[in-house]
């Protein structure tokens, strides 16, 4: 499925080749904290496409990972990075269906126009205590505009709220066919954070040890 998805999304993004580079999403601009210290802050633009949101975060001072399955989209992001002389962006071609994110790594995780429910636990764990998720995607009302759209990729009523229970909700909107959420992860003690990070590393090492070596051909890619 990953190979088919790569081909499909590459073809989609080729249709945008001659169009102007898109602007970042207004909801992201509204809910991104301003960096006021010399501390390093990290952001993830998940399923980021051509990177318009991730590059904007980088311009605000965040060290940003842009992850997408499409090499064509990431190439467009790379060109724009060069134009803007941005050096604090990592462009990562990944199969998001098998997403594996380090816990407590990002100050911001943003997701726009993308929904895979099995990625939500990884998104939650990747946000630092005090960090935030900024999420915007289509909900079931989108069927009134595109009746043939696959309902697997549409949010149910209050679904994002349910998935981020216990987080501080800064904003939640269900506006026509779009649902938006900004939520802040609760603070946790250093001992809890350290214990969970160690559990993650142990589980990952065990999984790596039990995975047979295979030859990879262009499965992942990093600029």
Ranges and model annotations:
Residues 77-78:
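Conserved SAM-binding loop
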Residues 40-49:
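Conserved class I S-adenosyl-L-methionine
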